[in-house]
Regions:
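Short acidic-glycine-tyrosine-enriched beta hairpin
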Residues: 95, 108-139
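Conserved short histidine dyad/triad with adjacent acidic residue
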Residues: 56-60, 71-88, 104-110, 139-140
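A structural connector/turn signal
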Residues: 72, 82, 91, 124, ...
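A short, N-terminal "cap"/entry segment at the start of jelly-roll beta-barrel domains
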Residues: 1-68, 174-177, 184-204
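Beta-strand elements of modular eukaryotic interaction domains
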Residues: 64, 84-85, 146-147
């Protein structure tokens, strides 16, 4: 019916102080932020034996730091090993702290209708890198890192924007696990040192 909206919009009795909540959040932010960390020490940075590999989280939204938009972790790849293989919608850059190796990247064709579909392209591109290099991973690219040395570890710093998650775009998919992955392993400095020297056998 024409102009039916002129009456329909009045329906409903629910009241919620959503705008006031925004004002309250803004007014309390300075005091809240004053308690958040601006400097993190190594003992503040948790380890994780993840499906992607051995990680030491440097900045994460769960770590109560002042960083609002970026997550970062250090990845350790033992001699002769590799990371897991995954893809995500957010672009990523990695700084090579130590070691040398290569990446395998595979672009995907994307179709977005009512649902999201991706199909890997046939071509897989290899990128060589060494300490001091920066690796760029484009959005939605399947990628994996390989340590080319049989006796020296690789350490990478990964940085990724967390805003994409707030936009509903946390499309992270693990396609292959790192050889060392074992959910029963609890990492500490001594255990990680064993991986660095190639003394710990991969789980598979």
């Amino acid at each position: 019916m024409a102009w039916s909206e002129s009456k329909a919009w009045r329906r409903g009795s629910s009241n919620q102080p959503f705008y006031q909540a925004l004002l309250d959040d803004a007014s309390t932010a300075p005091a809240r932020n004053a308690k958040r960390k601006k400097v993190l020490h190594p003992e503040d940075m948790p380890w994780e034996m993840s499906r992607q590999g051995l990680l030491k989280h440097l900045i994460n939204e769960a770590m109560n730091t002042r960083m609002e938009t970026v997550d970062a972790y250090m990845q350790i790849i033992p001699p002769g090993s590799r990371s897991g293989k995954h893809r995500h919608l957010a672009e990523e850059c990695l700084y090579v702290l130590e070691g040398q190796g290569y990446d395998l990247h595979q672009d995907c064709d994307v179709e977005i209708t009512d649902t999201y579909h991706w199909t890997p392209q046939d071509e897989v591109t290899r990128f060589e890198w060494e300490a001091g290099d920066v690796i760029y991973v484009p959005p939605n690219t399947i990628h994996q890192h390989f340590n080319a040395s049989p006796d020296k570890p690789v350490r990478l710093i990964s940085v990724i924007n967390r805003i994409f998650k707030a936009c509903g775009l946390n499309d992270l998919e693990q396609l292959d696990n790192a050889p060392e992955y074992d959910p029963a392993v609890v990492l500490n400095a001594e255990i990680v040192d064993g991986y660095l020297r190639g003394r710990v056998a991969a789980a598979r």
